[in-house]
Amino acid sequence: MPVTAPKGPTLSVVPHPKTDTSSSGPQVLQPSGWPMPKGYANGMAADGRLVVTGGVIGWDTEGRLAPDFVGQVRQTLSNIADIIAEGDAKPEHLVRLTWYVVDIEEYLASLKELGRAYREIFGAHYPAMALVQVVRLVEKEARVEIEATAVVPR
């Protein structure tokens, strides 16, 4: 009996405004007919050297956390930029971010400020992202932890 591919939406590669998708850098994957997401990508494709962070929190260089959620996010994103730079990656090489937050309502109430902080650090590059609410993080005062994956083009 012949096997046929399942019917479903087709996949499009959407040009990314900050990345040359024709030759290097990640490509945004967007199924045709799906609404464009705001502030993230549904999927990414990339070829190159993988740079992966552990769970990163918003510690400053003295090991202190900001007292507020947006301050912790800003420092966390800055820490991610510093870590991936050690692997010769730039923010535009990010293909995935997984956010862990202890209070999703705090996240939702801060979207405008979070977007501003994100763009200041990573620009207008929006990789695939997931947001997960957790009961707490290992560091008791931490409000957010983010894992990042970047792919440095060959």
Regions found by a protein language model. Give the residues of each.
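N-terminal presequence-like segments and the immediate start of the first folded domain
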Residues: P2-V95, V101-R154
